[in-house]
């Protein structure tokens, strides 16, 4: 009985450690079931995207900040440094920081909404605001520099006080270009968000567009830039880091990022870079 009370008052990472220490059980993260994507096989375009939505929606949702398992806890597992697991790897810079330094009055790390939370104005509400598939640890200053910029090629390198980050920004187009090592990661997270949130059950309908809006302050549920993201997806293919991260998130949220498991799904839905101008999701923002 005391075991039950004790476990209920632990967070998930602590529960994993508890079972390992007490019972010698090694908990492995869930792998993709053989039939997970079977309903999407043989489809393309909107039909495939809708089928994938049916597969990955209804996931387990966690709070942004809570005394129970929250986004902070999950990110410490998904993005931990494999050399020093007490640290997390900061997404845009590639630097590491003590995982326990959650924000820490601005001197630690924060949570980056890769699909900017103002693009749809969903904030940190459960669902798009707490979906770990599109959240990454980030240096506080770098997070502020990225702001809610669109994803596109930049011109001016963003130099942090600790040194170069490999990221670029463009003030004229309000765009952000991440370092080469995570360009594909960004693309696949953005594609996940459009696929997961299609406007059902009162949720937002997130859409990736291929034009930079004139109004950078718009809170419409859109993000750019599709043709650039397709290029990044191709040039920076899925690696073992992303695959492992997908597995860890699956063990919590019970859904996966299809574009990590099957990168070919991207072209099946959005086409290639050369065909993107004809894609039906482009919309008139005027």
Summary of predicted features, one role per range:
Residues 1-33, 276:
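Bacterial Sec-dependent N-terminal signal peptides
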Residues 91, 259, 276:
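Short clusters of hydrophobic/aromatic residues that line enzyme substrate/ligand-binding pockets
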Residues 103-273:
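Domain-level detector of nuclease and nuclease-like folds
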């Amino acid at each position: 009985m005391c075991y039950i009370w004790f476990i209920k008052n632990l967070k998930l990472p602590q529960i994993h450690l508890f079972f390992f220490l007490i019972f010698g059980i090694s908990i492995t993260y869930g792998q993709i079931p053989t039939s997970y994507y079977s309903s999407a096989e043989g489809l393309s375009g909107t039909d495939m995207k809708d089928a994938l939505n049916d597969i990955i929606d209804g996931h387990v949702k966690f709070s942004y900040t809570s005394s129970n398992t929250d986004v902070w806890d999950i990110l410490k597992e998904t993005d931990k440094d494999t050399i020093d697991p007490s640290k997390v790897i900061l997404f845009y810079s590639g630097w590491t920081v003590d995982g326990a330094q959650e924000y820490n009055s601005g001197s630690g790390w924060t949570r980056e909404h890769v699909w900017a939370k103002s693009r749809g104005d969903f904030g940190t509400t459960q669902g798009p605001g707490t979906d770990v598939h599109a959240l990454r640890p980030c240096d506080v200053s770098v997070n502020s520099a990225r702001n809610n910029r669109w994803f596109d090629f930049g011109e001016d390198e963003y130099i942090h006080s600790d040194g170069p980050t490999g990221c670029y920004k463009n003030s004229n187009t309000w765009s952000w270009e991440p370092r080469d090592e995570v360009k594909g990661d960004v693309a696949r997270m953005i594609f996940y968000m459009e696929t997961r949130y299609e406007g059902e059950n009162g949720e937002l309908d997130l859409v990736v567009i291929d034009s930079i809006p004139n109004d950078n302050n718009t809170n419409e549920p859109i993000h750019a830039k599709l043709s650039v993201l397709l290029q990044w997806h191709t040039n920076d293919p899925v690696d073992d880091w992303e695959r492992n991260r997908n597995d860890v998130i699956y063990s919590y949220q019970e859904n996966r990022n299809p574009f990590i498991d099957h990168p070919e799904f991207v072209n099946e839905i959005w086409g290639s870079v050369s065909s993107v101008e004809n894609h039906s999701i482009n919309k008139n923002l005027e």
